[in-house]
Amino acid sequence: MKKIKGFGGKSYGKIDKSSGFEQIQQKMRDEIEKLENSFENIEVSSTSGGGAVKVTAKCNYEIVSIEYEDSLLEDREMFNDLIVAAINEALREVTKKREEELSKIVGLSGLPGL
């Protein structure tokens, strides 16, 4: 920040070249925080085993539910594999959804510090 000085050492105010950029940065931070808070209300689902297992997760990385066909309980190893696969897919979907929503705000601006 520079001061404009006239003759005799008088100051005519301050020039703040970065204030506009800082305001944009702050607005984006506020929007991102608002988005982060909204993630607890956004859900995604995934399936494995041809729909035998369904996992629903919130976009704040919280698993909401796991549904499965009772017949899967007969083969514990397969049941475990399908649960893990559905959870991993749900988490990938959460990450994808978060990135999509964030890119709407940031707009791939490449602004540092965000």
UniProtKB/Swiss-Prot annotation:
GO terms for molecular function: DNA binding. It is found in: Cytoplasm, Nucleoid. Its main location: cytoplasm. It comes from the Bacteria. The keyword Aminoacyl-tRNA synthetase does not apply. One of its GO terms (cellular component) is bacterial nucleoid. Keywords: Cytoplasm, DNA-binding. Pfam families: YbaB_DNA_bd. Homodimer. Binds to DNA and alters its conformation. May be involved in regulation of gene expression, nucleoid organization and DNA protection. Belongs to the YbaB/EbfC family. This is Nucleoid-associated protein Tlet_0999.
